[in-house]
């Protein structure tokens, strides 16, 4: 199993989990095709992490790309940056800028 992570990505975890659902239990080639045509920002981030995990497998262990499949995709919540927007009568409303930690684990297909 080969792992790649991206931390503190400025994508809401809720939206990133939608993109993660596109690639679960697929081969690496199929997952890359799914993410290529995804319109989500999280899809682009997950594709980079997937490519990194595949590169780890190919370069470190000489595994063929065709034999790899996505074993696990995890999207965890990172820290939340808090900002404020001014409102009427001296008030304020909070703006929460959420971040995500993305983890992709790939491995050889079970036969």
Curated annotation (Swiss-Prot):
A single MF term (Gene Ontology):
rRNA binding
At the top level of its lineage, which domain of life is listed? Bacteria
- Pfam families assigned: Ribosomal_L22 (PF00237)
> Which processes are annotated in GO (biological process)?
translation
InterPro entries the UniProt entry points to: Ribosomal_uL22, Ribosomal_uL22_bac/chlpt-type, Ribosomal_uL22_bac/org-type, Ribosomal_uL22_sf
One Gene Ontology CC term in the entry:
cytosolic large ribosomal subunit
Recite the UniProt keywords alphabetically. Answer: Ribonucleoprotein, Ribosomal protein, RNA-binding, rRNA-binding
Q: Which family does it belong to?
A: Belongs to the universal ribosomal protein uL22 family.
Q: What does this protein do?
A: This protein binds specifically to 23S rRNA; its binding is stimulated by other ribosomal proteins, e.g. L4, L17, and L20. It is important during the early stages of 50S assembly. It makes multiple contacts with different domains of the 23S rRNA in the assembled 50S subunit and ribosome.
Quaternary structure, per UniProt, is: Part of the 50S ribosomal subunit.
State the protein's name.
Large ribosomal subunit protein uL22
- Native source species: Chlamydia caviae (strain ATCC VR-813 / DSM 19441 / 03DC25 / GPIC) (Chlamydophila caviae)
Q: Identify the gene encoding this protein.
A: rplV
């Amino acid at each position: 199993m080969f792992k790649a992570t991206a931390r503190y990505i400025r994508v809401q975890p809720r939206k990133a989990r939608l993109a993660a659902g596109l690639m679960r239990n697929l081969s690496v080639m199929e997952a890359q095709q799914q993410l290529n045509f995804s319109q989500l920002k999280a899809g682009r981030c997950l594709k980079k992490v997937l490519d990194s995990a595949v590169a780890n497998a190919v370069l470190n262990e000489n595994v063929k790309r065709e034999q790899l499949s996505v074993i696990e995709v995890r999207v965890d919540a990172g820290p939340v940056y808090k900002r404020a927007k001014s409102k009427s009568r001296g008030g304020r409303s909070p703006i929460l800028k959420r971040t995500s930690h993305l983890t992709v684990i790939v491995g050889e297909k079970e036969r």
